[in-house]
Amino acid sequence: MDINLILAQKYGYGLTFINMGVMGFVSIGFVTITGQAFNGPVLAALLTVVGFSANGKTVFNTLPILIGVLLASLGSKGNIFTLAVSGLFGTALAPISGVFGPIAGIIAGWLHLAVVQNVGLVHGGLNLYNNGFSAGIVAGFLLPIFNMITDNNNQRKMNIQRKHMNFLKTVQANIKKRIKKNEDEEKK
């Protein structure tokens, strides 16, 4: 039986299963930090995180999301259950953290909890749908912004490199002129 896993194809099954175990422990730690009891929806969210850890979720791209959710909870009135489940299902935003960095992940986690707490009436308060819907809204909102920032930074770096190359070409041309001038003076 062949399990077609992205990380398994790249790193092998052993490291993939280690990553899944580590993400399970991170998820259990998050639920413990929030103080939520392990019930059905929390275990489903935990197993979702573990399962998708075979497709690229790592500690490095999920911790910023969880930190963002925890920081957002400091100023919100939500209950512990919503916090725990939102944090675990909010790791659907892990690619944002993986591509754009941990600060972007913290912002995404922060916004995710805010959206989860405010769009529950749209679909009757079902938490699973609420988190998926909210993750889609947050990703759709943040991706163009982060892409624009990244493009501007890349353009700025390219402009600096272009100026640097022009400077080096000018220096090289001046050196060649001086060498040629010195050779001409030696011939005379």
Residue positions per predicted region:
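Short, highly charged, low-complexity non-transmembrane loops/tails of multi-pass membrane proteins
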Residues: 152-178
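Pore-lining transmembrane helices
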Residues: 1-154, 188
